[in-house]
Amino acid sequence: MSKYILEVCVDSVESAISAYNGGATRIELCSNLVIGGTTPDLELFKTIRNHIQIPINVMIRPRYGDFCYTEYEHEIMCRQVENFKNEGADAVVIGSLNIDGTLNEKQMKELIKEAGQCKITLHRAFDMCKDYFQTMEEAIKLGVDTILTSGGKQNCIVGAETIRNLVEQA
């Protein structure tokens, strides 16, 4: 049997500890999960880091809605990446798009540079891209380690064929 990764999205200390005790091998820390997730509070991260010993990936998303960020929002995101990196985040979960549904390479490069040695996950902004296969290639070239996707569908079961094709191309 192959080893799998069980990543659980959490938004509180209690849910992080429950995920850890339940066998999660890493967590994705967000706030506002009910609206798709936003950047969590730094103090929440620090408290969780003190109570669990598995990798913590941190969502960097300053607001709900689309993934097209203004320069001011991008500036905030860069600072958030720096702060979480400095506090010991294992990965940052990011995604920035252009209005035409393509990856915003300029913003992504800056966020990735700011992340330093942290691993990079491209979040579900990927599902909003106009061409998944081109976006995946761009993400790989940028140094993205992981992509979160439902294959552009409401869930991964429905999007399984697209996900399979993406895995084959990768």
Q: Where are the model-predicted features located?
A:
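Active-site-adjacent beta->alpha loops and helix N-cap segments on the catalytic face
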Residues: 13-17, 33-54, 72-75, 96-116, ...
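Glycine-enriched alpha-helix->loop->beta-strand junction motifs that scaffold or abut catalytic
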Residues: 21-27, 52-55, 88-91, 114-118, ...
